[in-house]
């Protein structure tokens, strides 16, 4: 029964089609589709918590997908309690990565809760989870279980280390994967200790890999009519992101080291202390180096035999950086910004967050997104990084309260009657947050 329902929803939902046209779904005239977001009509069942998974599903929601976030009654996503800071009782951490989602609070340790999740999976296009491998299978919600009732499903599993292997049973957190992948080894002062990056880059990179993989899965299903399983993990994501640093070791047998703000293969490319702050510049070729020298009024460095090529500048890094540092320290940051403006040299100050969100280009790019939260009122979060010509990314629904949409989803999506919903509420299998 669930399998038949899944097939009907997957391939007969309005706006869907399996062939023809330019878009993924072809059930509407092309003129109507031009202003639609590309994932309108796609439904995501989101069992993820914390950052990597919620970041992936938020990006999918930004593109028009309906995201149903499944949370534990009483507690919800772990990040709901992460703080301070809080706004009233809402964690700003949670608010940052959960816009454009609906929350249903369901106890998936109860068989009745498992049934609800399965019923939702049958009418969803994508199932995303970030449990330790095997945990959801124990509850009857593993890929094999969902595939039986929803063979169209794109099932994305986000873990710490992968589905198999000697570490697959371990829980995964950003800092641990950052350490084990080598990222922490190459981050920090040149002569200092390893440093955790200031934002959870491993989680975020994994979320972006999962986001891209889910999009690829939907395209694959468009071609084949079949779902698939996606194995995405923190360790693999971060090792893949080592790129040229990894290649230096794998091809050149060169062990990586920490460079602070500097670059191991390009000089000068780092932060320099000014009279009142820091300025980062990058000279990636000889022409750019010559321009930097002219701006700094150090033209004698251009033809110095020790600095004529990048290779020589890397060899003589310490001496050159000492000369440049002394010059940068003579003026305030604002003066250097004026001198570098229009030069063609990549440059910029090291900004505090106050500086970031008053930066003209940040505001111009629409990177501050405002929403009206049901209990907090107006909130601002970082907006989407990408813009599109055919549809707007500025309109967003605020992050949900825990269980805010439980009753709505059961009644309007799964067609439960009021009696069945009340029974589940009374038994604690589900939870509804009533907004005023």
Curated annotation (Swiss-Prot):
Similarity comment: family membership: Belongs to the CoA-transferase III family.
InterPro entries according to UniProt: CoA-transferase_III_domain, CoA-Trfase_fam_III, CoA-Trfase_III_dom3_sf, CoA-Trfase_III_dom_1_sf
Functional description taken from the UniProt entry: Coenzyme A (CoA) transferase that reversibly catalyzes the transfer of a CoA moiety from a dicarboxyl-CoA to a dicarboxylate in a metabolite recycling process. Displays preference for succinyl-CoA and glutarate-CoA as dicarboxyl-CoA donors and glutarate, succinate, adipate/hexanedioate, itaconate and 3-hydroxy-3-methylglutarate as dicarboxylate acceptors. Acts on intermediates or end products of lysine and tryptophan degradation pathway, in particular catalyzes succinyl-CoA-dependent reesterification of free glutarate into glutaryl-CoA to prevent renal excretion of glutarate.
UniProt KW keywords: Acetylation, Mitochondrion, Transferase, Transit peptide
GO cellular component, one term: mitochondrion
PANTHER family named in the record: SUCCINATE--HYDROXYMETHYLGLUTARATE COA-TRANSFERASE
Main location: mitochondrion
Name of encoding gene: Sugct
A matching Pfam family: CoA_transf_3
Residues modified to N6-acetyllysine: 392, 423
Gene3D superfamilies linked: Crotonobetainyl-coa:carnitine coa-transferase, domain 1, formyl-coa transferase, domain 3
Catalytic activity: glutarate + succinyl-CoA = glutaryl-CoA + succinate; 3-hydroxy-3-methylglutarate + succinyl-CoA = (3S)-3-hydroxy-3-methylglutaryl-CoA + succinate; 3-hydroxy-3-methylglutarate + glutaryl-CoA = (3S)-3-hydroxy-3-methylglutaryl-CoA + glutarate; hexanedioate + glutaryl-CoA = hexanedioyl-CoA + glutarate
Transit peptide start-stop: 1-8
Gene Ontology molecular functions: succinate-hydroxymethylglutarate CoA-transferase activity
Gene inactivation effect: Mice are born at the expected Mendelian ratio. They display increased glutarate and adipate renal levels associated with dysbiosis and obesity with aging. High lysine diet accelerates these pathological metabolic changes, whereas the depletion of the gut microbiota via antibiotic treatment eliminates them.
Protein name, UniProt field: Succinyl-CoA:glutarate CoA-transferase
